[in-house]
Amino acid sequence: MPPKKRRRQSQKAQLLFHQQPLEGPKHHYESCQQPITHTVQVPSKPIDQSTVTSWVSPQFDRAAESRFLIHWKPHRDQARRPTRRSTCKFPRLTFESPQSSSSETLLLSNRVQPQNSEKDPPRRPLVPLFSPQSCGELSVHVPHSLPHVFAPPDIQTPDSSVRDDPISPDQKENSFPSCILGPGTPSSPEPGPVLVKDTPEEKYGIKVTWRRRRHLFAYLKEKGKLDGSQFLVKI
């Protein structure tokens, strides 16, 4: 068992002096208080509490609020009860979709179709139709530098365009990427600047320091002052 703590007296007894000061109590930090001899009587008026605070704005008058806050205490049972999930009282927000192009609506309508339609006959997937006007609009929005180009599937063109301009299937495949990429895009990217030149075959196995000092390397090699271990790379 640990030893019991002894309770100490918080308030110490006042010191008692056997002799009283001869000249009365002394004030070290301020002047001595002289006795009041002349007194004047002033007539007093009763104060009305209702008129005193009439100029105070009601939003700053917290006398009534402080009364309720003092007596209010949270109950123990209220703290233990779990918080219930409150349902949302506000209506859901409705978003208006912007006007999309005809090609986007065709692709979205194909995705929205139910998957469990077994009785319906199989249909061909919808493919967006590109006209010369739409190709011109796409060339403005699509960036000119594309990493790769996909070959399009079988494109269904309207009958009127087929009758006017008969085009072979090979020309269709070639015209589709050109209308997307635009006429000014190059077919292959241009090679960039050469950072490091290739090492010639005759200099294989020679250290880089001696490749840069060609004249000194040839002179020392002719004089026989360079060994093979000094200028050759060890493998």
UniProtKB/Swiss-Prot annotation:
Q: Where is the composition biased (Polar residues)?
A: 96-106
* Keyword vocabulary terms for this entry: Cell cycle, Chromosome, DNA damage, DNA repair, Nucleus, Phosphoprotein, Ubl conjugation
- Cellular location of this protein? Nucleus; Chromosome
Please quote what the entry notes about the protein's domains: The RAD1-binding motif mediates interaction with RAD1.
Q: How does it assemble?
A: Interacts (when phosphorylated by PLK1) with POLQ; promoting POLQ recruitment to DNA damage sites. Interacts with RAD1; interaction is direct and promotes association with the 9-1-1 (RAD9-RAD1-HUS1) complex. Interacts with RAD18. Interacts with TOPBP1. Interacts with UBE2N.
Q: What does this protein do?
A: Involved in microhomology-mediated end-joining (MMEJ) DNA repair by promoting recruitment of polymerase theta (POLQ) to DNA damage sites during mitosis. MMEJ is an alternative non-homologous end-joining (NHEJ) machinery that takes place during mitosis to repair double-strand breaks in DNA that originate in S-phase. Accumulates in M-phase; following phosphorylation by PLK1, interacts with POLQ, enabling its recruitment to double-strand breaks for subsequent repair.
User: Where is motif D-box found?
Assistant: 123-130
Report if keyword DNA damage is assigned.
Answer: yes
Spell out the InterPro entries in the cross-references.
RHNO1
Q: Where is this motif: RAD1-binding motif?
A: 54-60
Q: Which GO terms describe its biological process?
A: cellular response to ionizing radiation; DNA damage checkpoint signaling; double-strand break repair via alternative nonhomologous end joining; protein localization to site of double-strand break
Instruction: Output the Gene Ontology terms for molecular function.
Output: chromatin-protein adaptor activity
Q: What are the annotated GO cellular component locations?
A: nucleus; site of double-strand break
Q: Where is this region: Disordered?
A: 75-106, 111-130, 149-198
PTM comment: the record says: Phosphorylated at Ser-50 by PLK1, promoting interaction with polymerase theta (POLQ).
The short motif KEN box is annotated over 171-175
Instruction: Point to the regions of Basic and acidic residues compositional bias.
Output: 161-173
Q: What is this protein called?
A: RAD9, HUS1, RAD1-interacting nuclear orphan protein 1
What gene makes this protein?
A: Rhno1
Q: Which residues carry this modification: Phosphoserine?
A: 50
